[in-house]
A protein has these predicted regions:
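Sec-dependent bacterial lipoprotein signal peptides
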Residues: 1-16
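Bacterial Sec signal peptide processing site at the extreme N-terminus
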Residues: 14-31
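Short, well-ordered alpha-helical segments
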Residues: 33-106
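C-terminal edge-of-domain segments
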Residues: 116-126
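Short, exposed beta-strand-loop hairpins at the edges of beta-sheets
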Residues: 109-115
C-alpha cells in the first residue's frame, strides 16, 4: 500500500518536459525570403515546496516521455535552449525567429506548493 501511495504521489508531483511542434505553413514565407520549417513550443515544469525545495522536475534529456528527476531542479532557461538546439539539429534548421521565453508560477495552498514552468517558443528557419 505504501508503494502504491508513493507511486501515485510521484506521478502527481513529477515535473515534465514537453516539446510541441507545428509545421504546416501552406507555402507561407517570411519577409526576407526565408522558409519556416516549424514552430516549436518547449515547456519544462517543476513542483517546489515553499517555492524553493524541488520535489520533481522534468528531465530535459527525455522530453515528451515520463522522464522526471525527483528532488532535483532541472528547471533552467539554459535547459530549454539546449532542447531547442537539439530540435534545430533534428529538422535541419539554421536560424531562429521570434524567440521568446517566460516563467510562470502557480501556487497551491499559498506558498506551500508551487508549480513553476519555463516556456520557450521559436520559429525555426532554413
Amino acid at each position: 500500500m505504501k508503494k502504491a501511495l508513493f507511486a501515485a504521489l510521484s506521478a502527481v508531483f513529477a515535473g515534465c518536459t514537453t516539446i510541441h511542434t507545428a509545421d504546416d505553413y501552406h507555402g507561407t514565407g517570411i519577409a526576407n525570403g526565408e522558409k519556416p520549417i516549424e514552430t516549436v513550443e518547449i515547456e519544462n515544469t517543476a513542483w517546489l515546496l515553499f517555492k524553493c525545495i524541488p520535489l520533481g522536475s522534468g528531465d530535459p534529456n527525455f522530453p515528451n516521455e515520463f522522464g522526471c528527476k525527483m528532488f532535483s531542479n532541472t528547471l533552467t532557461l539554459q535547459n530549454n535552449l539546449n532542447m531547442l538546439e537539439k530540435e534545430m539539429e533534428r529538422v535541419g534548421a539554421t536560424r531562429i525567429a521570434n524567440l521568446a521565453s517566460r516563467k510562470t508560477d502557480e501556487s497551491i495552498f499559498f506558498i506551500l506548493l508551487t508549480r513553476r514552468a519555463y516556456h520557450t517558443s521559436a520559429v525555426l528557419l532554413k
